[in-house]
Amino acid sequence: MVEERKLYICMRCGRTFSRSEMEILPGIRCPYCNFKIIMKVRSPTVKRIPAV
């Protein structure tokens, strides 16, 4: 099985979790503390764009 990356972080408890963990509860909430405000984690790689 392919390991799923952790994409979201809770603004209250600070835990990171994946979308599949978030789908356990109805609606968009933290699966650990049931808080509604979550943030998507940015990717660690830098996107380079050539200058025009």
Swiss-Prot record:
SMART domains on file: RPOLCX
Compartments (UniProt record): Cytoplasm
- Cofactors required: Zn(2+)
Domain of life of the native organism: Archaea
- Keyword ATP-binding recorded: no
The catalytic activity of this protein is classed by the Enzyme Commission as 2.7.7.6
| Catalysed reaction equations from the record | RNA(n) + a ribonucleoside 5'-triphosphate = RNA(n+1) + diphosphate
Q: Say if the entry is tagged with keyword Transcription.
A: yes
Which key words are in the record? Answer: Cytoplasm, DNA-directed RNA polymerase, Metal-binding, Nucleotidyltransferase, Transcription, Transferase, Zinc
Primary localisation category: cytoplasm
Instruction: Give a GO cellular-component term.
Output: cytoplasm
Q: Explain how, and how many, cofactor molecules are bound.
A: Binds 1 zinc ion.
Among the GO molecular function terms of this UniProt record, one is: zinc ion binding
Residues that hold Zn(2+) according to the record: 13, 30, 33
Q: Which processes are annotated in GO (biological process)?
A: DNA-templated transcription
Family annotation (Gene3D superfamilies):
RNA polymerase ii, chain L
HAMAP family in the cross-refs? RNApol_arch_Rpo12
Q: What does this protein do?
A: DNA-dependent RNA polymerase (RNAP) catalyzes the transcription of DNA into RNA using the four ribonucleoside triphosphates as substrates.
Assembly notes: Part of the RNA polymerase complex.
| Assigned protein family | Belongs to the archaeal Rpo12/eukaryotic RPC10 RNA polymerase subunit family.
| Identification of the protein by name | DNA-directed RNA polymerase subunit Rpo12
In its UniProt entry, the species of origin is given as Pyrobaculum arsenaticum (strain DSM 13514 / JCM 11321 / PZ6)
